[in-house]
Amino acid sequence: VNKAPTLFVNLERSGLSFQRRLWQVNTALGLDPQRKMLFINARGHTLAELGNSIRESVLRHSIQVVFIDSISRAGMGSLVDDRTANSIVDTLNQLGVAWYAIGHTPRADATHIYGAVHFEAGEDIGIRMISQESPGSLGIGLEVVKANDIAKPKKAYYRLTFDNAGLSGIETAKETDFPDLMVQEQPDVTERIKVYILGQPKAEASVSDIA
């Protein structure tokens, strides 16, 4: 993993909310809580309005990675329109650096991004995120669903823990730690049982454990 100057374009939430979240993430990762990150906080504005400002920030701060939260705030038209999808992808490509754009899924189908197929056609790497809540923690699964010029890595799982102040810890996890993640990924019951058993010590599990 290479560290690089990063810009996060926040179109969804208040700047104060993101400063609080950054403090919590830094603390959970064992970093200096005051560690800075460059943001453009523009809740209520659109990617179309901020294009020039983003490009200027990329040049001024030698940014190498840009995050956009999210494409639903692009302000370039209906997301189901092919021309809108192409315009958004073109705008991001014009930044001349690596970019990550957060997309949302339709209510009826969590396997792809809401909108035109050209969103997925225009991405080099597509990552699907799934989650499962449990008392005091949140299980996260990340799966690379598209990879143009790299080998697809294995699925990654993380456990986020929380206290009264918010996020307090981040650690790696196993898919068997969060059974509902297996349901989302593998609806076939037989395959889920197989994965669960193989994830146990000595690859053994009782009937009650499986149930």
Predicted segments with their positions:
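A broad detector of the eukaryotic-type serine/threonine protein kinase catalytic domain
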Residues: 72-76, 104-107, 198
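Conserved inter-motif catalytic segment of the P-loop NTP-binding fold
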Residues: 2-83, 87, 174-179, 187, ...
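Hydrophobic anchor at the start of a short beta-strand
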Residues: 6, 99, 205
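C-terminal regions of RecA-like/P-loop NTPase motor modules
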Residues: 59-62, 133-211
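Residues at alpha-helix boundaries and short interhelical turns
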Residues: 79, 96, 201-204
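Phosphate-binding/switch region of NTP-binding enzymes
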Residues: 65, 82-169
